[in-house]
Structure formats: C-alpha cells, structure tokens
Amino acid sequence: MTLSIRALDAALGAEVNGVDLSQPLARSDIEVIENTWRERLVVVFHDQQLSDPQLISFSKNFGELDPPGPNPYGQPFLKEHPELNVISNVVQDGQPIGNLGDGEAVWHADMTYVDVPPKAAMLHALEVPPPEAGGNTYFANMFAAYESLPADLKTAAEGKTAVHDASTNSAGMLRKG
C-alpha cells in the first residue's frame, strides 16, 4: 500500500491512508506522518486494529511517552501497560475498566496542568457512540485562534502564562496523592 494524505479542513486535520499501524513502519513513512501532524495538527487513521503493545510501539516512533495520570483510585489503568489511559463507561464485575466515559470530561486540553505538557496525544477509539449521542471528539487550532486575535489582545497576552490546577481531573474528581 502507498501512504496518502488528505486534508480534512482548512484549519486543521489530515487523514492518512495506506498504512497499517499494527506493523513496523519505514522511517520514511514515520517522517511523512510526523510532518503531516506538525503541519495539520491532527492526524486521523481509520480502521486500525491495534493491540495495546502495538499502539505503544507506534506511539514511541514520535518520542518518549508521558505517563497518563492515575485512575481515580491512584493506580494505572492497565498495570501491564502504564503508558495507556483507558476512557470507558464499561463496567466489568462491578468495577469500571476506565474513567471519563460517561460524559464527565467536558471541553479540555490534555495534560495542560503539567509544567511541560506532552507534544501530542494519541486516541485509539475502539467503540464510540454516534454523534447524536455525544460521541464527537473536537479539536481546535489554537495557533489560528491566536493569529485571529486583534492586535491589542495579542499585546495584552504577550508574556503571560496560565496556571492550570492539577488537583482535580477532567471530571472534577480530586486526584489521589
């Protein structure tokens, strides 16, 4: 298969086709994917069947992985794969297998509460509700948002920083520790 790229929107997003992420990729394909991500900010790969180790292996092509925060009980979601966060509303044997899957996570930016946020996040969606049931995931181009600001607002924002409180998670639950 030949790798192909299709832009999704003027502001951001590209669809990458002709690649099987469950298999090791040629360095040239990884470079095309990374350059596409840097230019388009969001990259979508449809119909990928990945095991947890395959997802981790693909992710490591782009740098060291940042550990996600612990689950509400202070533990990794998957002891055998602490690099992964499980977002799910599925309950097995009376215990949730993940968190934030019942609509608790409102509009947010992943891990902006850490001093040096990760350069990217990967989402491997296995089962998603239809859009009319709240199954949408949205992305925003903050570079374009900044560029569209009037000059006086850009000047007012220059040199400013924000502090994101890490005491609660995206669902508003107090973090352990």
Positions of PLM-derived features:
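Non-heme Fe(II) oxygenase catalytic core, chiefly the N-lobe of the double-stranded beta-helix
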Residues: 2-177
